[in-house]
A protein has these predicted regions:
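Canonical Radical SAM [4Fe-4S] cluster-binding loop centered on the CxxxCxxC motif
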Residues: 1-5
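Intrinsically disordered, low-complexity segments enriched in polar/charged residues with Gly/Pro
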Residues: 11, 193, 299-303
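Radical SAM/AdoMet-radical enzyme domain recognition
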Residues: 8-26, 34-151
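Short acidic, gly/pro-rich beta-turn/loop elements at beta-sheet edges
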Residues: 64, 91, 129, 157-159, ...
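Long, contiguous hydrophobic alpha-helical segments, chiefly transmembrane helices and signal peptides
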Residues: 55, 83, 123, 139, ...
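Radical SAM enzyme [4Fe-4S]-AdoMet core and its adjacent flexible, acidic
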Residues: 112-284
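Flexible mid-to-C-terminal extensions adjoining Fe-S/redox cofactors in radical SAM and related proteins
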Residues: 233-343
Length: 343
C-alpha cells in the first residue's frame, strides 16, 4: 500500500501526463479502510483535481458516520457506491453476504453531510437485471446524482454459475431493459455513446428531476451537435462546463426555449420567465441534475487492443506509470491475475 507521500508523487505524475487537472477516482481494493484517506483527498484537491470521488463498497461509510464528514471537509465531491440491488438475494449471489442494510446506512450518512452519491450497479442477467428502473427511481428518491450500470465483466473472483460468455448482458441490453421497465419514460435512444475512450465503452443520458419525476435533457437540446460544437468529447466535462455550453445554445436557440416552456411538468419550480441564462441556471440547478451511465469493462473474453490503446481511464501506479483500467484489472478465464501487481 503506497504512503500518502507516494500517492502525492503519483498524482503529480498524472498531472504531468494529462497536461492539467482531470477527474480523479480513488479506488482500491477498498480505499475507505485507509485512515489517511482524508489527507489524500486534501492532497488531490490542493493539486487542483477537478472532481474527486471515492469508489467504495460503503461498509466503512456505514460503520463510521463521521467518515463522510471528514471526507467532505477534506474536499471530496462524490462517492461512487457499489449498489447492486434492493434485496438480500442479489447481494448473496454477487457478494456472498446480505449488504442491504449496509448500503442504506452508507447512503444515509452521505446524505446527512451533503456528499453526492452515484450508485454503481453491476448488472448480471437473471440476478438483478429486472430491477434497473426501480434502481433509477430509488436513486432519484434518495437524491443521488446518478446511476452507473456496469454489465458484468468476468474479472477476478465471481460465481462461475452466473456467467456465460456467449450470453452476457451488454450496454444495449441495459438500455432496452430500462426502456421496457420504465414503459417508455426512458428510451434506449436517450443514451449517447461517449467517444472517450471508445463509443463501445460507455453511454450517457442527462436528466433533471422535479416533483419526483425524471425528464430527459437529451430530448430538449441536440446534445450530439453540442458535444461536437464545443469539443466536449475530447475533454473531461464537469457540470459547469456543460451548463455554459448549453447556456450559449439557449441564447441562440428559440427551439430550446419552446421545448422548455412546453414542459411545465419538468422541474416546475424552475420554469420561470426571464433571461434564457437565468432560466437555464434554475432549470438545470445541480441538485436536480441527474446522470445515467452504462460502462462495459473489458475482460479476457472481450478484450480489444484498439480500445485499450485509446483508453483514457487509467490506473496510476508508482513512478507515474499509467495502465489502462481494463488491462490492469484483467484476469485469466479462471480468475488468475494477469497484470495487477506486475506492471
Amino acid at each position: 500500500m503506497p504512503s500518502a507521500d507516494e500517492v502525492e508523487d503519483m498524482l503529480k505524475e498524472l498531472l504531468w501526463f494529462e497536461g492539467g487537472p482531470t477527474a480523479l477516482q480513488l479506488s482500491g481494493g477498498e480505499p475507505t479502510i485507509r485512515r489517511d484517506l482524508p489527507e489524500i483527498v486534501t492532497i488531490a484537491r490542493d493539486l487542483g483535481f477537478k472532481l474527486i470521488e471515492v469508489d467504495t463498497n460503503g461498509v466503512e461509510l456505514a460503520k463510521r458516520p463521521e467518515l463522510a464528514k471528514e471526507l467532505v471537509d477534506a474536499g471530496l465531491e462524490g462517492v461512487y457506491l457499489q449498489f447492486d440491488g434492493f434485496t438480500p438475494d442479489v447481494y448473496l449471489a454477487l457478494r456472498g453476504v446480505d449488504l442491504t442494510k449496509i448500503k442504506e446506512k452508507a447512503l444515509e450518512n452521505c446524505a446527512r453531510v451533503g456528499l453526492g452519491v452515484t450508485l454503481a450497479v453491476t448488472v448480471v442477467k437473471g440476478v438483478n437485471d429486472g430491477q434497473l428502473w426501480d434502481l433509477v427511481k430509488y436513486a432519484i428518491s434518495r437524491r443521488a446524482v446518478g446511476v452507473n450500470f456496469q454489465p458484468f465483466a468476468a474479472l477476478g473472483r465471481y460465481p462461475r454459475s452466473l456467467f456465460d460468455p456467449l450470453d452476457r448482458t451488454t450496454i444495449s441490453d441495459v438500455q432496452l431493459q430500462l426502456q421496457r421497465q420504465s414503459e417508455g419514460v426512458l428510451r434506449a435512444s436517450d443514451f449517447i455513446p461517449v467517444p472517450c475512450p471508445d463509443p463501445r465503452c460507455s453511454a450517457l443520458m442527462y436528466g433533471c428531476y422535479g416533483a419526483g419525476e425524471l425528464k430527459v435533457i437529451n430530448r430538449l437540446v441536440e446534445v450530439e451537435s453540442l458535444v461536437d460544437k464545443y469539443g466536449l468529447k475530447d475533454n473531461f466535462v464537469d457540470f459547469d462546463e456543460l451548463l455554459k455550453a448549453v447556456a450559449d445554445e439557449v441564447g441562440a436557440s428559440r427551439e430550446f426555449a419552446r421545448n422548455l416552456n412546453s414542459r411545465p411538468d419538468c422541474c416546475p419550480d424552475a420554469c420561470v420567465t426571464g433571461s434564457s441564462l437565468r432560466l437555464l441556471l434554475e432549470y438545470l440547478k445541480p441538485e436536480g441534475f441527474f446522470c445515467l451511465g452504462c460502462h462495459f469493462a473489458q475482460d479476457s473474453w472481450t478484450v480489444d487492443l484498439k480500445r485499450l490503446r485509446k483508453c483514457c481511464v487509467h490506473e496510476v501506479r508508482s513512478k507515474g506509470v499509467l495502465i489502462p483500467f481494463c488491462l490492469y484489472n484483467m484476469t485469466s478465464e479462471d480468475g488468475g491475475k494477469l497484470y495487477r501487481g506486475k506492471l
